[in-house]
Amino acid sequence: IAFRIYVSIGMARMKKVPSLSFKDALEYTTKGNKEALITVGIIKDGKAEYRVYGENGKEVEDRLCTYEIGSITKTITALMVKRAEKEGKLELDDTLDKYLSLPDGKKYPKIIDLLTHTSGYKPYYFESPMIENFFKGRNDFYGINGEMIVDRVGKVNLDKESYSFNYSNFGFAVLGVVLENVYGESWKKLADDFLLNEMGLKNTHVSDESGDLGNYWDWRDDDAYLSAGSVTSNICDMLKYAEFYLKNDELYRECQESVKTI
């Protein structure tokens, strides 16, 4: 009961945020929180800048914080999928059984369905490591590896010809496993190499819990859900990442093109 009350209060408070001004939203979300550190970046007229805010939305001394960027990780995974397509390693209209060892005689979604969250998959599926993770206060997805993901894909029954949008962390975990199979490398290694050597983002990588803020999610190097939300970065790299899309580079431009109507 207490948990439900806590969630209800939290949801009620969050509903207020969209109607607030930028300044009011900052003050509201940092009210009375002495540990609050929110970094806001702006790109205007080709110039990027940022400011850091603390308790009660007050601007504080400039510092570069390492944040968990959460599901922005998915956009990086999507870029890696697009790169794999350009290299001829996969096709977006291929179904998963072309890249994963799965039971015959079943219907599997296409790569493009996973990218657009129209695969029919749930946000996630229960796996046994989640029990221990709950009691140890860990990241829910800690210890769920690629083998478990492939096994789950083989068990899920998808009987419709098409599915409507349903946000799926599981779907992006599957994409990570597909990338591992087509490249023969772990998603962590692929992502870290892509971020550093192809994108030049020196402070963006799969989380190793080494940032300055603490309380980062714990991950194993072979966790399948890394590709759904494990990357950490700072505001300078994130502004640079945003500029890649604004500058109309070929890879980023193609990733913004419409691929499916949902």
Region annotations inferred by a language model:
Residues I1-R4:
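Hydrophobic membrane-insertion alpha-helices, especially the h-region
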Residues V7-S21:
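Ser/Thr/Pro/Gly-rich low-complexity linker/stalk segments immediately outside membranes or between
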Residues G32-L37, K58-L114, L158-F170, L226-G229:
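Short active-site loop at a secondary-structure junction
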Residues L26, V40, G46, K74-T77, ...:
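Residue-level preference for non-acidic, small/hydrophobic
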Residues K107-I262:
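Short, surface-exposed loop or secondary-structure junction motifs
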Residues S19-I69, K89-E91, G154, Y216-D218:
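Short, conserved catalytic-motif segment at the N-terminal edge
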